[in-house]
Amino acid sequence: MAQHNDIRGWMMDGDYNAIEKVCSEFLNRDYVEVFEIGTLYGKSAIAFDDALKTVPHHITTMDVCEGWIGPSDEIIEMLGLDDNFKAMRDANRSTAEEQFDEIHTNILNRDITFIDDKWELGYDYPVVSPDIVFYDGSHSYVETRDILQYWSEIAVEGKVLVIDDLIGL
């Protein structure tokens, strides 16, 4: 079973297991480069770091750091979500400054680079061709379409794109 971490965020047991499964395909490599879009507090970046601990690697994670308030009570009710979801939402809320500080605290002493910026197609990446791209950004149609376009331009055999929370385009 995958290793859990106690960082705030939205990962469930299946998410840790999925990250571990993706990373297991890279454990025989000499070096692995991960590019994550959508850091929140660093929970998934650290899950990748832990899953790749037996192979040299580096993780670059990017988030616009606007803070996070989550969906409104009205949307939660419309979706039929319960008070447990509201409690999780409330526990994960932050200001932009709190989010920024928490990310840096969480990734301290790890081979993870954080970029405080908005991802967009055409961004001048520090990672030209990552082995793993993990997209957990805004989940908008446009941004998801753009990450697929970006991936189609850099994808070669042996590289992986993981899109979190994709319900439908």
Feature annotation, model-predicted:
Residues 2-9, 16-169:
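S-adenosylmethionine/decaboxylated-SAM
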